[in-house]
Amino acid sequence: TLEELSPENCLFFDIETTGLSWKTSHLYLLGAVFYENETWIHRQWFCQKPGEEKEVLLAFSELLSTKKLLFHYNGTTFDVPYLMHKYTFYQLPAPWEGTRQLDLYQLFFPLKKILHLKHMRQKDLENATGLFREDLYSGGELIEVYKKYLLSGDEHLLEILCLHNKEDVEGMLKLLPLFSIRTLWTGNCQEFITCTHTVEGNLLLSVQPEHPFPVSFEKKLPHVVLRITPQKLLLEIRPEAGCKKFFYSNYKDYYYLPIEDEAIHKSVGAYVDKDHREKATPDNCCKKVNGCFYPQYEELSLRLSGMSVRKKTAGFFCRKILMKIRNNF
C-alpha cells in the first residue's frame, strides 16, 4: 500500500558474519538505513566478541518493531534465515512478524538480461547505474579482516569492515530508481504512451516514465528496437507486410474451400457446390488477411499465422501491441 511505501515505514538492512553456517559462525556487524526526522539515517551494531550477538539482535528487533517494510538484497537466501536461527538460539521472538519483506535481488533479477549483466551481485547493479564503491572487499574477504581486527584493535581495519556494510545498505536505497524500469512490465504505463510512425512506416511508441529511468541502453530483437534514456523509452517496431491466415475457433460451423484455401461459414457455404467444399478442420478453418503485421512474443486468443498451422511467432495487428508491450520486455 501507499502507506507501507512511505519512507518512515521502510528499513534497509544487511549483515556481516564470520561464516555461512549460523551454528559455526557468529554475527559481527548489522547495518540498517531508515528514515527519521525527514532524513535518512545509517546505524550499525558491531560485535567485539560473539557474546554480544544477543544485544545486537535485541537492538535490531526494537528498531524493526517501528517499521512495516523490510528491504534486503538476497536476504531471503542468507540474511533472514541466518538471523532467524540466531533469534531461536537465544530464545528471542522473530522481529519480522507483521512486517512485509522486499528482496531487491528477486525483484530486480529480470533486469539482468536487459542490462547485459553477467552476475546479479549488488555491486553489478550499482555499476550498471553508474554507482561505484570505495569498498574493495567481498564479504568473504572481510572475515579475515575481522579476525585481524580482533587481534590488533587496528581502527583502520574497523573502518574497512564498517565501510563495506555501510555501502551495502546505502546502495540498496540508491538502487530503488530501477523500479521505474520494472514497472514497464508490472505496472500500467499505457497512459504515458504516445504512438507515431517513422518515415519508413515503422510504429514508434514513446513512453514518458512517471519517474526517470536510472540507466540508458538499447536492446534489439527481430523487428523491434528498444531504446531507454533517463527521460524516455522509445520502442520502434517494424511491421511485416504479407498475407496471414485468421483462424476461427468454432471450426465445426465452417466449410473449407480447397481452391480458395480458406473457410466460410456454413450459412454461406451451403450455396457452394458440394464438390468444391469440405468440412473444416482446426488447421484449415481460416480466412486470408492481407496487411501489415507486428511481431508477437506470446500466444493470443487471436490466431494469425503466416502458415497453415498455429505458431507462437504469429503476427498481430497494431491495436494489440499496446496491450502486450509491458510483457515483452
Model feature map: region roles:
Residues 30-32:
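Short beta-strand scaffold segments in enzyme catalytic cores
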Residues 1-13, 20-25, 35-329:
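DEDD superfamily 3′-5′ metal-dependent exonuclease/proofreading module
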